[in-house]
């Protein structure tokens, strides 16, 4: 083997060992980002405090923030209680939306207009993920409770400005 080739192989082996060592060392380290929670939290169904709104949804909804603050930067978890025959027109969010159906059936579809023929029924226990900026809509046929988890500040942007209840 030539000296040049032997040198290249040695350099490659040393590089792999150094990289592997860095990866193993990094696995044992604590996260570098500060952890936002200092204490645990338990919320039972009878401990949920419902409020009217939010104003960004059509009238009839109720919400309860379980942790975090959807208006500020960071993780949050909230619940939405929606009445039967509730409609949320086509909209999008600047961050991923994680939805878990706690009770009832939530219907969701993708597209630029609310179309009851193009949705998916999500019964109790279902989970949905809508990626950031995905145009979607939703509706209920019975009272439904959802758990929404995301990263704030949370926003809802209606495709048709006339659908935005904040503009009325």
Mark where each language-model region is.
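N-terminal secretory signal peptides that target proteins for export/translocation
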Residues: 1-6
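Bacterial N-terminal signal peptides
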Residues: 10-21
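A short, N-terminal "cap"/entry segment at the start of jelly-roll beta-barrel domains
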Residues: 27-76, 163-168
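Double-stranded beta-helix
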Residues: 39-41, 117-120, 139-168
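Glycine- and acidic-residue-biased ligand/ion/polar-headgroup-sensing regions
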Residues: 83-86, 93-113
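Short beta-strand His + acidic residue motifs that chelate non-heme Fe in jelly-roll/DSBH
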Residues: 88-90, 108-109, 130, 135-141
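Short acidic-glycine-tyrosine-enriched beta hairpin
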Residues: 112-132
